[in-house]
Regions:
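Acidic, serine/threonine-rich low-complexity regulatory regions at protein termini
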Residues: 1-295
Length: 295
């Protein structure tokens, strides 16, 4: 009897269990997702922190999934702590290293010396491990959470329908525009504070809907996408509006930064976020060269 050899893949969205995994991700994003209050005293520094994370990820050739996970950890940690200004950059870097340990190959995990141009050279590995431990303890060591990028990889496989390629000569052009636009909207979703309050699967579905609408594909929300995502078109209107508004305000004529890869090297079991915690101070040594601010 011939063996049924199946193609092996490290991408969960290409496996026969993709539907089950997607349902699992959606279940836990709803049950365990924290409430985001946008109340960090350093929230005005968020654009700089996100830009720094992207820059390091580009240098280390990290995936888009890793970037989204790092920003997610940073957002919720900042929202629940009164961080000193001179520790916030180190916290963002620690979130990136934790994300890399989950989503990336060990060789791509950034080293502390990567940040020497931003933080003090006096920062030791011991100090840095303490910061990482603070973050892990806050999330109760559950830091592999579903992000927009995780869901996007699954939804992208269901983006097109047969009627989209009525004119076959434009198929390659359409696919190229699709890939660039998806990445652009993902970047835009990272920049929006208001979108943090939405479930990642809803933001990802809104990116797909907005992209199809922008490309002029009819219908812009297909029955297949409705079935796969579990969302009706009307469910995504508000999220699409916020996404489009953010693109208009911040991404006009800005080249797409394709420095990091579009997908994760493989699926990691999503770890559940801890429940909402009481706001607290973080006790980290003064190890960053910048002006100290009061709690």
């Amino acid at each position: 009897m011939a063996l049924n050899h199946q193609r092996r893949t490290d991408k969960w969205w290409e496996t026969e269990y993709s539907d089950n995994i997607h349902s699992y991700l959606q279940y836990h994003e709803v049950k365990w997702r924290m409430v985001y209050g946008a109340r960090s005293p350093q929230i005005h520094l968020r654009p700089v922190l996100v830009k720094t994370i992207r820059s390091i990820a580009k240098t280390c050739e990290m995936s888009n999934v890793c970037v989204h996970l790092a920003v997610t950890l940073m957002d919720f940690f900042m929202d629940n702590h009164d961080l000193k200004f001179d520790t916030i950059m180190l916290v963002s870097f620690a979130c990136l290293t934790l994300a890399a340990k989950i989503e990336e190959h060990c060789l791509k995990i950034p080293k502390l010396n990567t940040m020497q141009n931003v933080i003090s050279k006096d920062v030791t590995n011991s100090h840095f491990r303490k910061v990482e431990m603070k973050i892990l303890m806050f999330f109760e060591f559950n830091v592999a959470v579903p992000t927009v990028a995780h869901f996007i990889e699954f939804y992208k496989d269901h983006f097109f329908c047969d009627s989209d390629f009525y004119h076959n000569e434009f198929a390659s052009i359409l696919k190229d525009k699709f890939n660039r636009m998806i990445l652009s909207y993902q970047d835009a979703s990272l920049e929006s504070i208001k979108l943090i309050s939405y479930n990642p699967s809803m933001v990802a579905a809104s990116i797909i809907l907005t992209t199809r609408h922008t490309l002029g594909l009819v219908p812009c929300w297909t029955p297949q996408l409705r079935k796969v995502t579990g969302y009706l078109k009307k469910d995504l209107v508000q999220c699409c509006s916020l996404l489009g508004r953010n693109v208009m305000q911040h991404r006009k004529f800005v080249p797409i930064d394709e420095g990091y890869l579009s997908s994760s090297p493989g699926f990691q079991s999503p770890i559940i976020m801890a429940s909402k915690k009481k706001r607290s101070h973080i006790d980290v040594p003064n190890i960053i060269l910048s002006k100290r601010t009061a709690f």
